[in-house]
Amino acid sequence: MTYVQVENIDKWYESGDTREHAVDDLSFSVKEGDIFTILGPSGCGKTTTLRSIAGLETINSGRIRINDEVVSDPSRLISLSPDKREIGLMYQSYALWPHMTVKKNITYALDGRDYAGDNDERVVEVLELVGLPEIGDRYPNELSGGQQQRVAFARALSYEPDVLLMDEPLSNLDLKQRRQMRTKLLDILDDVKMTTIYVTHDQEEAFEISDEILVMNNGKKAQQGPPEELYQNPTSSFVADFIGEANTFDATMANGTAERCLLRGASEPLELSTNWTEGNAISEPVVTIRSEDISLFDGPNDDRDGVENVITGTVAQKRFRGDATLYLIDVNGVEFKVQTDDPHYRPGQQVTMEVPSKSVAVVQR
């Protein structure tokens, strides 16, 4: 069942005689109980989109529905205030009142929403839910960053909203804390079964927590789908490059078909067999290859049976990444990124790359 529906929304700001679009004709839907992530670089419009759903921004056109109720529609002069939208909000800054105890921070939110149950009992419930049952009498400055984050989460859940909106909630934590809190958040959201819209610029975070991801760029939808689909089948060079470690090359079609492509910029012809099948015409083809889909072997070897794309190159750089090593391989002036768990290759060494054609995608620039 669709629980949140965003239909062709626009949000712009006047700048002299021009309009600067923060969100441009954006549409998507969120299923009930899903964790739906809006992913994109800084300035792409993801936070403005979240604030528009929350009622903190007034859209210029389009329509937003929550649980089949229209909450924003400028054409009908509908714009419900945030407290009328049955949403929970969690910000990048935890926005805890410093002069209030943890308990009072949560009861303040309950009072503001006219919570029908017993406030004291609800505070106990949500603090137990986030694993902090003993801190109700402490003040925010007596808590670690991770604890403050969990208190903010408890507060957002306290009045049992229909939809939870989370704007970069883990960005103020260090890497270890972020990974720990992702696990905790997933456990809690699995318990409460709450429809969640989550904003982040962190691809790893988005892939780990999401049922569905919307990638945004320049205020527009770039692509939407399950994490695996976005990773394996990007529809544009932007999505391929933004998600994961991808090689992206401008190309031309060989023999008029994208089944084989010539990479531009190489000093000698460099042609690859691709996974292209008949589909929409591509006017500006870009070849994309995931760095982990390329295999490396010692020395030049152009005669490897059963592999369509066998390429000889030279290791230009080596970058250690803990559980993997990233190599930059120069092939006639074109640079390939190859990620592998084999650390023995050295800069200056000649190597052979095997690139399965099923891993060579062709997308529109």
What are these regions (language model features)?
Residues F36-T37, L89:
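Short beta-strand immediately N-terminal to the Walker A/P-loop
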Residues E86-Q92, L96-D241:
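ABC ATPase nucleotide-binding domains
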Residues K11, S27-V30, P343:
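Conserved A-loop
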Residues A54:
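Helix-to-loop junction immediately C-terminal to a conserved catalytic motif
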Residues G62-P74:
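Conserved ABC transporter NBD signature motif
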